[in-house]
Amino acid sequence: MKLNKYIDHTILKPETTQEQVEKILAEAKEYDFASVCVNPTWVALAAESLKDSDVKVCTVIGFPLGANTPAVKAFETKDAISNGADEIDVVINIGALKTGNYDLVLEDIKAVVAASGDKLVKVIIEACLLTDDEKVKACQLSQEAGADYVKTSTGFSTGGATVADVALMRKTVGPDMGVKASGGARSYEDAIAFIEAGASRIGASSGVAIMNGAQADGDY
């Protein structure tokens, strides 16, 4: 198992500086992570920095509330891709989901999938705000809309990924859709627990610490 290729090396805090982004980019190249996940304003910088590497550029859309309209999310997606984004992590319309307005939730995700072309789309369901039934419904709608992944969390709400949520999401979507655990993996042990529960990608700001733990254990 190549643990490094499970990791989306992430820096999304609003106060992030260019120097901090450049540090994350250098680390991502050193460890050959799956991707770097940055806010849209840093996508062009990341794309230029990573152009000669295998590391993908991931960004966030409708972030962190998910409460923009489908048209705005679609525009954000196209803009991000034009700047060099390879992967799109979009926040679901959480309020519409909890209201039971599933048509809007579906339209919202479909708008981003359509705007993304052949780029990878991960749908952030913000599991900490949902009941288990709502988590299942969010995963089903994401699958129906043609997204590639479901993702647990933004990291900006009341909690991050849990092993139980990852397991439920994997059970719901089956083997043919990705599951990303985000906002909860701070150590090698955390990462392995999420992978064993069904995660195919891990979003973490502590990717280097996770890998250093893996090196200490000699198993990655």
From Swiss-Prot:
EC number in record: 4.1.2.4
Functional summary from the UniProt entry: Catalyzes a reversible aldol reaction between acetaldehyde and D-glyceraldehyde 3-phosphate to generate 2-deoxy-D-ribose 5-phosphate.
PANTHER family per record: DEOXYRIBOSE-PHOSPHATE ALDOLASE (PTHR10889:SF1)
SMART domains: DeoC (SM01133)
Listed name of the protein: Deoxyribose-phosphate aldolase
Enzyme class, first EC level, given as a word: lyase
GO terms for cellular component: cytoplasm
One GO MF term attached to the UniProt entry: deoxyribose-phosphate aldolase activity
Metabolic or biological pathway: Carbohydrate degradation; 2-deoxy-D-ribose 1-phosphate degradation; D-glyceraldehyde 3-phosphate and acetaldehyde from 2-deoxy-alpha-D-ribose 1-phosphate: step 2/2
Residue ranges of the TM segments: none
The reaction(s) this protein catalyses: 2-deoxy-D-ribose 5-phosphate = D-glyceraldehyde 3-phosphate + acetaldehyde
Entry superkingdom: Bacteria
UniProt signal peptide: none
Swiss-Prot/TrEMBL keywords: Cytoplasm, Lyase, Schiff base
Tagged with keyword Plastid: no
Stored InterPro entries: Aldolase_TIM, DeoC, DeoC/FbaB/LacD_aldolase, DeoC_typeI
